[in-house]
Amino acid sequence: MKYLNIILLLLSFNLNAQAWITDDDFESKINEKQAFGDNQNKPVIVEFYAKFNDANKFDQWSELKDVIYYRADIAVCSAAKKKYKVRMAPTLIIFKNGIKETVFKAGLDLTLPADLSDIQEAINEVNQASQF
């Protein structure tokens, strides 16, 4: 029973875990379908991140609701970085069914010009727009 509790505890931490995305799986991840049908698909946020700018990464990702969150290292995801015209890190892109919906780009000071509430509001708008 003790081991079962430990396993359940570890699994619960993984539910909010942030996953990394690479060029190899980028398109499949932003086009992910959930098990409950198209109307239940959550938007996907990809944060383009740079190790040299670790101080300015988006740390509040676990507080976002109704979204799947991935982080992409710009040194590893050069094809995706080029395709989506990412020039600054951090950059957050919200996708819905593989379509780019909203972009939050860092400024020249390499800080994200949006806070948690701005990003959550954009997620909510994407979710509402896809309901019919």
Protein language model features and the residues they cover:
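Bacterial Sec-dependent N-terminal signal peptides
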Residues: 1-20
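Local sequence-structure signature of Cys/Sec-based thiol-disulfide redox active-site neighborhoods
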Residues: 20-65
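Short acidic active-site motifs
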Residues: 32-33, 76-80
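Structural recognition of the beta-strand scaffold that forms the well-ordered cores
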Residues: 45-47, 91, 103
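Solvent-exposed loop/turn segments at secondary-structure junctions
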Residues: 51-54, 75-77, 100-101
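Short, internal strand/loop/helix patches
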Residues: 68-76
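Structural micro-motif
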Residues: 84-96
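Non-catalytic, surface beta->alpha helical segment in thiol-disulfide oxidoreductase systems
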Residues: 94-132
